Amino acid sequence: MPGIKVHPNESFDEAYRKFKKQVDRNLVVTEVRARRFFEPMTEIRKKQKISARKKMLKRLYMLRRYESRL
């Protein structure tokens, strides 16, 4: 869980910016949104399969693009 130490000479805005940056780095908000509703295992697998396909197609595109430059 994100947490920061506020120094005595630090303004609220600076501390708030630090906290927001730490929350973004730890992906807290995205995880909370993902867990907001129950998702069956079949849906999770389906999303993983789709993302794996997208990743593979992206790699294939980059490889073909690289080969065409040789």
UniProtKB/Swiss-Prot annotation:
One of its GO terms (molecular function) is structural constituent of ribosome. Transmembrane segments: none annotated. Gene3D superfamilies: Ribosomal protein S8. The keyword Ribosomal protein applies. InterPro entries: Ribosomal_bS21 (IPR001911), Ribosomal_bS21_sf (IPR038380). One of its GO terms (biological process) is translation. The keyword Ribonucleoprotein applies. It comes from the Bacteria. One of its GO terms (cellular component) is ribosome. Pfam families: Ribosomal_S21. Keywords: Ribonucleoprotein, Ribosomal protein. Belongs to the bacterial ribosomal protein bS21 family. HAMAP family: Ribosomal_bS21 (MF_00358). This is Small ribosomal subunit protein bS21.
